A protein has these predicted regions:
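C-terminal accessory/binding modules appended to enzymatic or scaffolding proteins
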Residues: 1-34, 95-153, 163
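A short, glycine/Asx- and small/polar-enriched loop/turn
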Residues: 5, 44-49, 160-163
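Structured core of small recognition/catalytic domains
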Residues: 149, 154, 158-173
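Conserved small/polar residues in nucleotide/adenosyl-binding loops
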Residues: 175-178
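C-terminal, non-catalytic macromolecule-binding modules
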Residues: 53-109
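Short beta-strand-to-loop capping motifs
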Residues: 11-15, 53-56, 127-129, 168-172
Length: 178
């Protein structure tokens, strides 16, 4: 990638509550920056998720990192609910990166827009904000806390800006007209 060495990670497993939180929590704990992701849940209950993550500065052996991520993430996903309930870490292998000068001087005003889909069976949540370490993990924890189910997502990091789109559903999103 332009910013450094990265990994493409595919996760194919039976969907489970808090699976997305567990995956994002792992990446956050290891200071792996999610640059791009596609999240899909099949009608038959399987999660097919792909991520492109950047390694932190100081990580040198790409093959060793890939093997480590493959092993550790597989172990974590054996019990995604327990992994999701672990406290967010501040560190990882190489510490946390600081906010860039550009994002401090020209921050992106956070925006969130929630709209029903065409059939009104799910919702489309669009989030735009300044990128920061742990942002996607924080969003995933909010989804889990409010029992919002993630059906599909497209995650994009464009420099210091994130543009994420989530297709979600859940009982807290149901509305009634009184």
């Amino acid at each position: 990638t332009e910013q450094g060495e990265g990994l493409q990670i595919m996760v194919y497993t039976r969907d489970a509550p808090d699976l997305f939180v567990a995956i994002c929590g792992y990446f956050d704990a290891k200071s792996l920056s999610i640059q791009d992701a596609r999240i899909h849940t099949t009608r038959h209950g399987w999660a097919l998720d792909s991520f492109i993550v950047l390694l932190p500065e100081g990580a040198s052996d790409l093959r060793a990192q890939a093997t480590l991520v493959e092993h550790e993430l597989a172990e974590r996903l054996k019990d995604p609910q327990a992994a999701a309930q672990a406290q967010p870490s501040r560190g990882g292998y190489f510490g946390r990166s600081r906010q860039s000068r550009v994002s401090r001087v020209f921050p992106v005003m956070p925006q969130a827009e929630l709209q029903p889909d065409e059939r009104s069976t799910s919702w489309r949540l669009s989030v735009t904000a300044t990128d920061r370490p742990g942002l996607l993990h924080a969003l995933a924890r909010v989804f889990a806390q409010h029992e919002v189910n993630l059906l599909m997502a497209k995650i994009m990091t464009l420099g210091d800006r994130v543009e994420d789109v989530f297709i979600v559903d859940g009982s807290c999103l149901l509305y009634t007209s009184d």
